[in-house]
Amino acid sequence: MHRQSIVRLTRQCGGLPLVELPPPYLAPSLHFSLIRSPVQCSSFSSTAVAAGRERDLSKSRGVSAIHRTGPKFRLGVSKYPLPKPVSPDALEKRYPTPDHGLWGFFPKDKSALSTPEYDVAHGRSWSIQELREKSWDDLHSLWWVCVKERNRIATSNLERQRLKAGYGEWEANDRDKVIRVTQKSIKHVLRERWYAWEDAQRLYKNGYRPQDEDNQE
């Protein structure tokens, strides 16, 4: 029997006892409605609350500023006027520093790219025999001169790749190779001095004294 027909029949007869009802497997809704008490339920919504703002019922909701629709809520505005940019004529002129340290990343003429003639005009690398006669301060200064020159070459190569100049890459790389040979020679000389200092320290710990040999003579 259909559920609506059973419910209609129950209302007309003023309610049927459990004996007159059909079996539960035929009409489970009738048995559950008589046994269970009504449960209060509410609708579920995931929409956030409007935070105390009432709906304005505006038909122009979401219309852009092109249609001249003003804000729907009052906005706070500062009473101070907006700052105005200073005229370039009123600004104090600043002159560049001619001896600034960053000019070391550029050629002597302060151009963005070094010319092939400038990069190819270099001498040979320092030899190990020449560097052995230099002091620690001289080697330290020469090392940082090489570092600054390699940074300048790297800056020119990066700018050359950005501009896609198509020239000067071979000359710059050849100059960089000569500088790297000098740096390797400096490391070799410093390594020799380090080993010599270790040997002298080991001999001194073992009891060797140079003045003893002078006294024996």
Curated annotation (Swiss-Prot):
It holds the Pfam family MRP-L47. GO terms for molecular function: structural constituent of ribosome. Keywords: Mitochondrion, Ribonucleoprotein, Ribosomal protein, Transit peptide. One of its GO terms (biological process) is mitochondrial translation. GO terms for cellular component: mitochondrial large ribosomal subunit. Disulfide bonds: none annotated. PANTHER family: LARGE RIBOSOMAL SUBUNIT PROTEIN UL29M (PTHR21183:SF18), RIBOSOMAL PROTEIN L47, MITOCHONDRIAL-RELATED (PTHR21183). Component of the mitochondrial large ribosomal subunit. Mature mitochondrial ribosomes consist of a small (37S) and a large (54S) subunit. The 37S subunit contains at least 33 different proteins and 1 molecule of RNA (15S). The 54S subunit contains at least 45 different proteins and 1 molecule of RNA (21S). Belongs to the universal ribosomal protein uL29 family. This is Large ribosomal subunit protein uL29m. It comes from Aspergillus clavatus (strain ATCC 1007 / CBS 513.65 / DSM 816 / NCTC 3887 / NRRL 1 / QM 1276 / 107). The gene is mrpl4.
